[in-house]
Amino acid sequence: MPAISNLMRLTSLTITPHTPWNVDCQVAPFPPRWLAALRDAYHRRPEIKPDWSLPTRGLVELLTGLDPAIVNVSSNPASGRFIVALPPGADTTVLAAAVAAWATTEVTPEGCDTDWWALCQPCDLHFHTETINLLDYHVRPNGTAAGASQMFTLLPSFLAQHVVTAKLPLGGRARDWILGPPQRDGRRSAVLWPPERLESARAGDALVTAKITFHVETVPNHPLPHVHADLSTSRFPLMPVAYVPARGDGPPQATIWLHAPDGFLREHEPHTLLAAAAWRAFDRASRTRQWQWKPGLATTLAWLTHLPFPNPEKVFTDPAAAADEGKIRAYYLYSEGSKSLAGDIDDLDELAAIAAGEETGKARTLLHPANTGFVPKDHIEAHEQLAAALAPVGIGMLEPCERVGKRNQRKVKPAETPGQSYTLELWTQSALTREALLAALEQHHQLTPVPDPADPTVITFTGELNLRVILKDAGALGAGIDRPDGDRQPEATLLGAYANQVAQRIGQSPGPRAAILELEDGRYFSRIRKIDPKPALKKAFARTDRRLQCLRPAKLFTPPANPPKSARKKPPAPYPGTGFTVGSILRASAAINDALRQLGHLSTYETPDTLPDLEHIGIWLHRSGNTCIPIVIRLNPSGPATAYLASADGTPMPPLPYSDLPKALATGKGRIPGGKNQEGQVARFLTNALGVGHDTHDRVVFVRSSSFRTRGWDWLQDKHIYPDRLILPGIELDDATATPRVFSPQEWPGLRIVRVRERSGTDEVARGFAADHETTSVRISGLFQFSDRVFYSINPRSDQMQTPLGATKLDPDILSNFTRQAANPRPLEIYPVFLQPKDDPAAYATLASGLRRTYLHTEQATVFPAPLHLCELADEYL
């Protein structure tokens, strides 16, 4: 077995200090005459408000994709650097026509008295040469790198182009890449192209490819920008798509990639991909819902190009033909929950029924044969190849981070307070799931059942805790919510009405209880075309003083027809003492634990000897539209957990037991409505949570960075944060403003603040693997130190991550590996930013890392430390 490394390397790249990457670019401003006419025409539309900006998103995507010479288009037409192109520059005739088409379709879609084609003349676009340093940056007063705007808007495209031109090798051979669709935030991908075809008798044929996405990030108080290059997959079904689930209250939407092998406007132009949005909107002519292009890139491009443009309806009814025929190929970007036609794709009657939105009787879940994720070997190879290819321009690897403490450092074990008593209701539809839950209590939790002789629906379990279990019939509670024909109410309205119905049916609980409800998952309701009732059920149960946990139906164990013959591998067997699968019992146990967690069944633990006895405080800011919901949870080693919510008018609210938090949130408490007073109320609430001016006891506050990325507590942002120099919430730290009041640890005795930042959907934190992976195990876990105050915590590999380490997806000769699911623990950035004198930053980073694995309700390590994890879980009641 390979040794475990003590060195971790992040997969992001950095730049060599003061090494320029100068490129000569052609730069053009937006013609003032065009801009004045466009603004005037746009604001003459009655539905457009005076302060609304021009809808430039489609224009940015269109111009960037039409001419591969263009590397950036600003979303602000008033910018002096509106278009940036490579020499010898872009085709002004194409650009002028594109602006005219965009103005016609998006600025004045109903027509106006301006002839945009006559107004937008190529001679109005004036390009001039400008030398731009792509690696230009400076260092802020707090020591954090501040990249120039071109690092975020231009550099990713140049890096992606570098990969395409160099045919970046992977798997020991040069590969063909194409520029991915441009993105509004400046990110750009290099995509392996064409995609690979996978054949599957179960899921149908499909396409899959890998891509590397470039973006620039910073690390607090670190003087160099980091270049992230994230490896991921893109999947495209070839089976007819009958149904795409809606996300939110609007109609179903989808992303379609477009590729013109011979160019969108001119033959032999360099290849690039475009991404267009489609939605299933009501068609007045046919009186049915059909797939249509959303206003934006697709509608403008269809107006502009001379090539036959894809019909979005055909992209869904016959994806294989759309991806293989025509001058413009279209690829539906796979979305979980989509529904497919299981019959023959040549069945014209079936296809017509799908196009009309009718039930066909053959639709089933559309499973893509390819699974997401890559093994560590793939991430490391992409990282090493990029570092070698980009070294000539001054971009290379980061130095390894050293492990903090011992590799086998003792885990903080949670302890259970003995003698606790709870009431648990089991709402089941089948006797099978009910028996699985009772078996989990007896066999997995080692509790002793004692039936109530007076009531057959009540069973008391005794042991480490006392549990009164009440059996309930769920009936049709979990059957799903129907949407009547022609009903266009928002989904939120239907969920709200159903929550009221359920609350009325189940009635008020006589006291605080936990509940488990047998319920299918979201994919099931997508298949049967009903609305998933889970959000409504959570609120209805909470309002009646029940904390709800949902559980999918249990399964009996069935012996395999062909058991494994290996003597080293145990044959499959049911969970000991039961007839159920191991997975069913473990899922039932997890549901029990999480239901009890909501009743306040939380762990206690001893504070490490190196730290004082600390109160642990989590601060989280939820947002719902314009409404803010700040939540504070306090875990006191010597007392019960408490929660704090804000009031709508700013009046302080008394603390409430953690177990009462679900009911409070479900009944609408804790909301701060939008308006001029909102930011001040949020700031006062957060300041009170810190204990300013009245608390002196030892406490550590955990705060999530992304909760305050744009507002609420500017000091937590990378560009403002500074060790042990605290600035209160609610103060806008504009670079031009005077420095506000700064507080030192001596002024606030006992207070510590730890900021954490997760990888999240924006990939703000890079992945991390063993730096010396050639001689040690490539996977790594523990706490690693990046700088004096910045650490990275990596959880151990979970039991579900069983994909062999050698299952590469970057070898085109082994496509079967794409069918494997791969995942790797993601580093959590930990920054002990405000500490008391003589505190050791590593000790508080170690505490934060250990609190990711200190629970009674789950054996899985969580993304956040316990106080923040509990705050995050409250989201299900909002």
Give residue ranges: language-model regions:
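Long, contiguous domain-sized segments
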Residues: 2-295, 318-319, 446-533, 539-878
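Long, charge-dense tracts
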Residues: 272-531
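Long, highly charged amphipathic alpha-helices
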Residues: 436-440, 536, 684
